[in-house]
C-alpha cells in the first residue's frame, strides 16, 4: 500500500467515524476561494480538488455529504461550533491548530512560494528550494539571512490566519511591512496593483497569472 492510499484510508476512516455520529448527512466545510484546492465556478457552485475528493470519499463510505462554504478566518471556530463536521480547505497541520481540533493524516502536500511581479528588484533573489526551516543549521541561517536582507522594509502580503502569516510574524525575516487579507484573491490583486512588493502563499495560488515570478520555498518548511 503506497503512501497516498494510506493517506486516503485515514481520511475515509475519519469520515466514517463522523458518519456514525451524524448518520443523516456529513457536512464538510471549505472556503471556496483557494483554487485549485477549492473555489467556485461562474454559477457560484463549489468546485476544486478538495470538493471532488470530499464527494468521492463520501460515496465510497456510502454517506450523504454537504459541502458548506465558510470564510477562512472563521473556519476553525465554525468547526468547533459544529456548523459542519469536518474541514477540507487546504488547512496545514500545525501544533497550534492541534490544540483546538483533530486532524486525519494529511492527504496532499503543497509548496509555498514568494511571488513578485516581473521586473521587481526582488526578481533575481536567490531562494534555493529544499531548505527546511525547522531543522536549523548553516543552510537555513544563510537562507534566512538572504530573505531578511532582501525583504527589509518591503511590504509583504499574505492571507490571514495561515501558516504563511505565522512565519512572517515570527521575526525570522526581520522587519517587514506585513499586510494580511481575508482571501487569497485579495492578496493577488494587491500584488498585481503594486500595493504589495512581494506575496507569500502556496505556489499554486499564483499559477493562474503569468505575471508572477516565483521565489520558491516549500510550505512544510515554514510551519
Q: Language-model features: where?
A:
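Solvent-exposed coil/turn segments that connect beta secondary-structure elements
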Residues: 31-33, 70-73, 91-93, 108, ...
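Sec/Tat signal peptide C-region and signal peptidase I cleavage site
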Residues: 18-23
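Bacterial N-terminal signal peptides that target proteins for export
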Residues: 1-9
Amino acid at each position: 500500500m503506497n503512501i497516498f492510499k494510506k493517506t486516503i484510508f485515514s481520511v475515509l476512516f475519519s469520515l466514517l467515524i463522523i458518519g456514525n455520529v451524524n448518520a443523516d448527512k456529513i457536512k464538510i466545510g471549505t472556503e471556496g476561494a483557494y483554487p485549485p484546492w477549492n473555489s467556485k465556478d461562474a454559477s457560484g457552485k463549489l468546485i476544486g480538488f478538495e470538493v471532488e475528493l470530499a464527494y468521492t470519499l463520501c460515496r465510497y463510505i456510502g454517506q450523504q455529504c454537504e459541502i458548506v462554504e465558510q470564510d477562512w478566518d472563521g473556519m476553525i471556530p465554525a468547526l468547533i461550533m459544529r456548523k459542519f463536521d469536518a474541514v477540507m480547505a487546504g488547512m496545514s497541520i500545525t501544533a497550534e491548530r492541534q490544540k483546538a481540533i483533530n486532524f486525519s493524516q494529511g492527504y496532499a502536500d503543497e509548496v509555498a512560494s514568494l511571488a513578485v511581479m516581473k521586473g521587481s528588484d526582488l526578481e533575481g533573489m536567490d531562494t534555493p528550494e529544499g531548505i527546511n526551516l525547522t531543522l536549523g543549521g548553516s543552510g537555513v541561517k544563510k537562507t534566512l539571512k538572504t530573505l531578511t536582507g532582501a525583504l527589509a522594509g518591503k511590504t509583504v502580503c499574505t492571507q490571514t490566519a495561515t501558516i504563511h502569516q505565522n512565519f512572517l510574524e515570527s521575526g525570522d525575516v526581520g522587519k517587514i511591512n506585513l499586510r494580511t487579507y481575508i482571501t487569497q484573491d485579495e492578496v493577488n490583486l494587491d500584488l498585481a496593483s503594486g500595493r504589495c512588493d512581494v506575496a507569500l502563499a502556496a505556489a499554486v495560488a499564483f499559477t493562474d497569472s503569468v505575471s508572477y515570478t516565483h521565489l520558491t520555498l516549500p510550505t512544510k518548511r515554514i510551519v
